[in-house]
Amino acid sequence: IVVSPLIALMKNQVDVINGYSEDDSVAHYLNSSLNRAAINRVESDVKSGKTKLLYVAPESLNKEDNLPFFQSFKISFIAVDEAHCISEWGHDFRPEYRNIKPTLEKIAVARNVRHIPVIALTATATDKVRIDIKTNLGMPDPKEFKSSFNRPNLYYEVRQKVSDEDTDSQSIKFIKSHEGRGGISYCRSRKEVEELAKKLTLNGFRAAPYHAGLDNEVRAKTQDDFLKENIDIIVATIAFGMGIDKPDVRFVIHYDIPKSLEGYYQETGSAGRDGGAGICLAFYSPKDLKKLSKFMDTKSEMEKEIGRQLLDETKAYAETSVCRRKVLLNYFGEAYTKDNCGNCDNCKRPKKYIEATDALECVLSAIKALKGQYEQNYVVDFVRGRATDHIVRDGNDKLPEFGNGKEINNDIASIWNPVIRQGMIAGYIRKDIKHCGLLKITSSGKEWLKEPRPFSVVPDREFVDSDDGGEGGTSALDLPLYQQLKGLRHDVAKKHNIPPCVIFQ
């Protein structure tokens, strides 16, 4: 059994699997889109042994009425796809995922077995999310298989969002420089999706909207048109998610910076799956994060705290001048040893490093004095000597290290956040993932304090409008020949009713 939240994708997955068999019942799916007759057929094929692979939505697995069915046949193992959905620290938390473990326990009891083997899969799990997955699925000591998060063929760029009109203009210019290439543009709201899709259509692009407010048939047709290259661009909300497997998506644009780096990584991951170049362009404004922060006002304190930390990480990524690949991989707990990846805006247009040895010493001394009990903003206020209510209430304004960074040159007064972030990348500081991002000094940090060595940082980025269309344009192509080949590929694909990317890349 494969547990998956991607209802829109299930039919496609099952069709592909059945395509390898002469029997169209070797794979089935079970979710809320099926009528009673279809459900009866699925249950019959499963019980008779014809079906070897069953995709189910978590809601269908956990539904009380379905329990006798799942208890009536032998299950060799359960594959939990998109397993990050089980964690409140994940970017796409689904409460129904928390009920998978109790349901499996009920099935195991009825089948008179100790447990049902479980494999959990995700492309976007931080250390905290991995711990949550193991805890909530009852996997105390599982074997873990972790591949690299690095996608070397993807180019990452963040541009300043000055206004909606300017963002539209930059996006249209960018897409024109990649005309005929498949791409996805993400917007935060349905209204923005509809408006942008219309603007792109008016500018001569083959684009279509995709969001949860559209009928299932409309969304299915849009997906199909995108696969068959009847349209080049899908403008979507996060409802699109990972709902399509098109290997030759050449660019992903974010009109609004996502609310978490997991969401950003997963959505940009649609680009360049065939190994070819993919461009990931995001537009960023601090105002967008303030709006997202306001949306959390109605949530519980725990949800607000988690949401705030996720936004802080997104802000750090957007504003950094360090290699974006290094920052992104570090967030997922993976070291990237190169200083320049050569394939992000910061590495293409690097800023100068500035001396920050004294600043790092101030920060590490402060974290040590505070016994690793406080998060980043608190530490920055402490180092700067800001007697906030929180610091005074804790009595930490009396510590000798309080304000130890006051003497740092005013020209680099904004250096503290870059020092902390880049100190984490260097391995001197770590965030306590179990306790709301408290800053801790590592053993390497303690050694550095004993014998300080030169340390420099890149100040955070000042946003400037980019005057080009990003990397990977079509200037080196023979465009007439490219269009002829593309047309030929489309005709052959249409004749055989298969996606064009299957013919050739």
Per-segment meaning from a language model:
Residues A8-M302, I306-Q309, G333-K338, D345-N346:
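Helicase motor core with emphasis on the C-terminal RecA-like subdomain
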Residues N153, D248, K291-F295, L310-T314, ...:
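A general alpha-helix detector
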Residues E303-A335:
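Short, charged low-complexity linear segments at domain edges
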Residues G307, T337-Q505:
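Accessory DNA-binding and partner-docking regions appended to nucleic-acid-acting proteins
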Residues R114, S321, G372:
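Flexible coil/turn residues that form the inter-helical turn or adjacent wing/linker of helix-turn-helix
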Residues I1-L6:
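Walker A/P-loop
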Residues I175, F226, A318, I367-K371:
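Short helix-to-turn junction characteristic of helix-turn-helix DNA-binding domains
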